[in-house]
């Protein structure tokens, strides 16, 4: 009977303790008494350090996301400024306003002045795929840069435009590509539209680069549509979720996450890590303590 053996063993230990000399008993009691506060102190230190490491991990993740979002915002600002510059370019204004230009003059103007104005920026920004001007004054398409306004309806982003003269940012995750669009009005009449098409992967590259093992990242627009999402999680319980709200609920419940909102586009950036990866950091810290 194991229980009986344990009882006999405990009786033997108690008997040996009673039979000990007083100084030996006192020594054992002093050792035990000194170990108790040391154990409590070590346990308290471990708990405090674990909390500190978790807090630092969260702070580091938040800092990484802020830097990443700022890097993407910097690109957004560059292309917004480029659109604004082109909007007020005298050559662009002349093309938009001159509706009775003969074919020869139009060809000369398009080929030697306006077309270079819309193609040269590609040499300085590798994220630019193309810049287009859609205008009522343009009767026949010239290359890919100058397009009749009526053909704008064929573009995937056309139906998403609002009646706004500010730069509008839109993302197509299927193509995938990003566009920055600015509409130009004469009173209430739409006369022209400038559009910069950008490389999706190059714009989101800063976020892609910080997604490491057991982490993920996501970008949502103001309507909650997923503009970008990627995970490097071994046991990914998010893989079958396509709705942003479902993903966010799962992330908030099972992951450590941080978020940041773009001041220019209103896009919301998320960076999240598995709790397992955070605990791994705590474990590594404990090993260094030992």
Regions picked out by a protein language model, each given a short descriptive name:
Residues 7-51, 55, 59, 290:
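Extreme N-terminal signal-anchor transmembrane helix of membrane signaling/transducer proteins, especially
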Residues 222-223, 231-289:
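Extracellular/periplasmic juxtamembrane segments that couple receptor/chemosensory ectodomains to their
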Residues 111-125, 189-228, 232-234:
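Solvent-exposed, extracytoplasmic
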Residues 156-172:
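Regulatory sensory and allosteric helical modules in signal-transduction proteins
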Residues 133, 184, 219-220:
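Hydrophobic beta-strand positions
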Residues 150-155, 173-210, 270-274:
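Conserved beta-strands of PAS-like sensory domains
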């Amino acid at each position: 009977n194991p229980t009986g053996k344990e009882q006999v063993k405990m009786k033997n230990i108690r008997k040996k303790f009673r039979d000990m000399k007083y100084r030996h008993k006192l020594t054992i009691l002093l050792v035990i008494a000194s170990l108790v506060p040391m154990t409590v102190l070590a346990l308290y230190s471990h708990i405090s350090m674990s909390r500190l490491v978790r807090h630092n991990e969260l702070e580091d993740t938040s800092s990484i996301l802020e830097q990443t979002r700022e890097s993407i915002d910097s690109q957004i600002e560059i292309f917004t400024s480029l659109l604004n510059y082109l909007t007020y370019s005298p050559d662009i204004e002349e093309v938009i306003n001159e509706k009775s230009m003969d074919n020869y003059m139009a060809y000369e103007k398009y080929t030697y002045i306006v077309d270079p104005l819309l193609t040269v920026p590609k040499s300085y920004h590798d994220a630019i795929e193309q810049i287009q001007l859609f205008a009522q004054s343009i009767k026949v398409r010239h290359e890919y840069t100058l397009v009749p306004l009526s053909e704008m309806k064929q573009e995937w982003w056309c139906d998403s435009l609002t009646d706004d003269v500010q730069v509008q940012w839109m993302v197509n995750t299927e193509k995938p590509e990003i566009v920055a669009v600015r509409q130009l009005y004469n009173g209430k009449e739409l006369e022209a539209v400038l559009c910069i098409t950008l490389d999706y992967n190059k714009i989101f590259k800063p976020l892609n680069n910080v997604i490491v093992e057991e982490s993920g990242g996501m970008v949502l627009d103001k309507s909650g549509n997923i503009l970008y999402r990627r995970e490097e999680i071994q046991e990914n319980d998010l893989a079958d979720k396509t709705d942003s709200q479902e993903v966010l609920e799962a992330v908030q419940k099972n992951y450590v996450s941080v978020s940041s909102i773009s001041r220019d586009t209103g896009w919301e950036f998320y960076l999240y890590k598995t709790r397992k990866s955070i605990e791994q950091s705590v474990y590594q810290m404990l090993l260094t303590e030992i």
